[in-house]
């Protein structure tokens, strides 16, 4: 039975409607999938950028923290150096004051004579040479001569050795030093410095740990004394 034109048109419309509906559904499916993929990619990009930003600021924060530590360490070192310099300056001032007071000892002739007696005899014992030369300030010559005369017999008794001790009258010690003597062996290759300044420096060096402790307290980090 042949279809009429109306039936043909109806079937064609039905087929076109079906095709159109299927096309729309396919388009919607494609759009939905594209939107889903877009959202996934967008989320991935956002997360990647967020991680990069977090990593950047974490790195910056660590750098700033490290810079703070370095600056703090530098400030602490500078402060420590200032304290050490201040301590050294104070100790130097104390030593300079002590050196200035040596002149008072020299002005007391009786006290100075006793001191010279000890310095000369000590120098002889340190050298233990058969011939020794004593140098002193020109103004101290009489006192040093008396000290040498006292020291020779004491030296001979103690060492059971003879000794020749001369006072150098050609090259005196500088007048600006506080006093004391220098003692040489016969060829002047060995010297014992027993000037008042050298003795004070030696005593100061030996007592430096005690001086620091008295002035600034004990150092908890110091295992050995100077």
Swiss-Prot record:
InterPro entries linked to this entry: ATPase_E_C, ATPase_V1_Esu
Phosphotyrosine PTM sites in chain numbering: 56
This protein's GO CC annotations: apical plasma membrane; clathrin-coated vesicle membrane; cytoplasm; cytosol; endosome; microvillus; mitochondrion; synaptic vesicle membrane
Superkingdom to which the source organism belongs: Eukaryota
Tissue and organ distribution: Expressed within the midpiece of sperm tail (at protein level). Kidney; localizes to early distal nephron, encompassing thick ascending limbs and distal convoluted tubules (at protein level).
GO BP, sorted A to Z: proton transmembrane transport; synaptic vesicle lumen acidification
Modification sites for N-acetylalanine: 2
Phosphoprotein in keyword set: yes
Primary localization class, coarse: membrane
Keyword set, alphabetical order: Acetylation, Cell membrane, Cytoplasmic vesicle, Hydrogen ion transport, Ion transport, Membrane, Phosphoprotein, Synapse, Transport
Topology within the bilayer: Peripheral membrane protein
GO terms assigned for molecular function: ATPase binding; proton-transporting ATPase activity, rotational mechanism
Compartments where located: Apical cell membrane; Cytoplasmic vesicle, Secretory vesicle, Synaptic vesicle membrane; Cytoplasmic vesicle, Clathrin-coated vesicle membrane
Pfam family, one: vATP-synt_E
Protein purpose: Subunit of the V1 complex of vacuolar(H+)-ATPase (V-ATPase), a multisubunit enzyme composed of a peripheral complex (V1) that hydrolyzes ATP and a membrane integral complex (V0) that translocates protons. V-ATPase is responsible for acidifying and maintaining the pH of intracellular compartments and in some cell types, is targeted to the plasma membrane, where it is responsible for acidifying the extracellular environment.
Subunit structure: V-ATPase is a heteromultimeric enzyme made up of two complexes: the ATP-hydrolytic V1 complex and the proton translocation V0 complex. The V1 complex consists of three catalytic AB heterodimers that form a heterohexamer, three peripheral stalks each consisting of EG heterodimers, one central rotor including subunits D and F, and the regulatory subunits C and H. The proton translocation complex V0 consists of the proton transport subunit a, a ring of proteolipid subunits c9c'', rotary subunit d, subunits e and f, and the accessory subunits ATP6AP1/Ac45 and ATP6AP2/PRR.
Record-stated family: Belongs to the V-ATPase E subunit family.
Protein name (Swiss-Prot/TrEMBL): V-type proton ATPase subunit E 1
Species this protein is from: Mus musculus
């Amino acid at each position: 039975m042949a279809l009429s034109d109306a039936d043909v048109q109806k079937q064609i419309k039905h087929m076109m409607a079906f095709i159109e509906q299927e096309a729309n559904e396919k388009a919607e499916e494609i759009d939905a999938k594209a939107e889903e993929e877009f959202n996934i990619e967008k989320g991935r990009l956002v997360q990647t950028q967020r991680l990069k930003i977090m990593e950047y600021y974490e790195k910056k924060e660590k750098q700033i923290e490290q810079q703070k530590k370095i600056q703090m360490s530098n400030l602490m070192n500078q402060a420590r150096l200032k304290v050490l310099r201040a301590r050294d300056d104070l100790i130097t001032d104390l030593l300079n004051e002590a050196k200035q007071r040596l002149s008072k000892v020299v002005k007391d002739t009786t006290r100075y004579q006793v001191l010279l007696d000890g310095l000369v005899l000590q120098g002889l014992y340190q050298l233990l040479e058969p011939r020794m030369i004593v140098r002193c300030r020109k103004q101290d010559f009489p006192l040093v001569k008396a000290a040498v005369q006292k020291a020779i017999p004491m030296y001979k008794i103690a060492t059971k050795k003879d000794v020749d001790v001369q006072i150098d009258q050609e090259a005196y010690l500088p007048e600006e030093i506080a006093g004391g003597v220098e003692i040489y062996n016969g060829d002047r290759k060995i010297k014992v410095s027993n000037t008042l300044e050298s003795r004070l420096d030696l005593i100061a060096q030996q007592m430096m740990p005690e001086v620091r402790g008295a002035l600034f307290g004990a150092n908890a980090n110091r295992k050995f004394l100077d």
